[in-house]
């Protein structure tokens, strides 16, 4: 027979530890007087947790959603970063990224196999396409 505490999830244990350890650290008299670390001022390290604890706002919501957030620069730079880090054909994705930025896909004039037949019949005798 398993004891009742054997099925406690990792998230529950983490939350309990945060609730037990953070209030004394945050409410201590020296906590508010601590200066911002050099690495946070220079933006050379990840200081998201430090900013959550010492900044204004709902700290509990920020801490609970910290692991769920996916940071990434918006726009083309973020998409380029995701393309480079993902598996697959990087060259094809990067080469077509500019075209996909604001352009809508071109409408297909004819559905299915008829498009292939129309394209094949429009090729000029010199090998150039008449389309």
Swiss-Prot record:
Pfam families: Orexin
GO MF annotations in UniProt: neuropeptide hormone activity; type 1 orexin receptor binding; type 2 orexin receptor binding
Entry PTM: Specific enzymatic cleavages at paired basic residues yield the different active peptides.
Signal peptide (UniProt feature, chain positions): 1-33
GO cellular component, one term: cytoplasmic vesicle
UniProt keyword list: Amidation, Cleavage on pair of basic residues, Cytoplasmic vesicle, Disulfide bond, Endoplasmic reticulum, Neuropeptide, Pyrrolidone carboxylic acid, Signal, Synapse
Propeptide part(s) removed at maturation, as residue ranges: 98-131
Chain positions with Leucine amide modification: 66
Gene Ontology annotations of biological process type: eating behavior; neuropeptide signaling pathway; positive regulation of cold-induced thermogenesis; positive regulation of transmission of nerve impulse; regulation of neurotransmitter secretion; response to starvation; sleep; temperature homeostasis
InterPro entries hit by this protein: Orexin
Disulfide bonds: 39-45, 40-47
Modified sites of kind Methionine amide: 97
Entry keyword annotation includes Translocase: no
Modified residues (Pyrrolidone carboxylic acid): 34
Protein's recorded name: Hypocretin neuropeptide precursor
Subcellular location: Rough endoplasmic reticulum; Cytoplasmic vesicle; Synapse
Annotated family: Belongs to the orexin family.
Main location: endoplasmic reticulum
Function: Neuropeptides that play a significant role in the regulation of food intake and sleep-wakefulness, possibly by coordinating the complex behavioral and physiologic responses of these complementary homeostatic functions. A broader role in the homeostatic regulation of energy metabolism, autonomic function, hormonal balance and the regulation of body fluids, is also suggested.
């Amino acid at each position: 027979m398993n004891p009742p505490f054997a099925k406690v999830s990792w998230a529950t244990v983490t939350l309990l530890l945060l609730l037990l350890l953070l209030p004394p650290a945050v409410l201590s008299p020296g906590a508010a007087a601590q200066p911002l670390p050099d690495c946070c001022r220079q933006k050379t390290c990840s200081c998201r947790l430090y900013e959550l604890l010492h900044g204004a706002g709902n700290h509990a919501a920020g801490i609970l959603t910290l692991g769920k957030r996916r940071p990434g620069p918006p726009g083309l730079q973020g998409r380029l970063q995701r393309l480079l880090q993902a598996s697959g054909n990087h060259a094809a994705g990067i080469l077509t990224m500019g075209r996909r930025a604001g352009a809508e896909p071109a409408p297909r004039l004819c559905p299915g196999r008829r498009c292939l037949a129309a394209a094949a019949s429009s090729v000029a005798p010199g090998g150039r396409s008449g389309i």
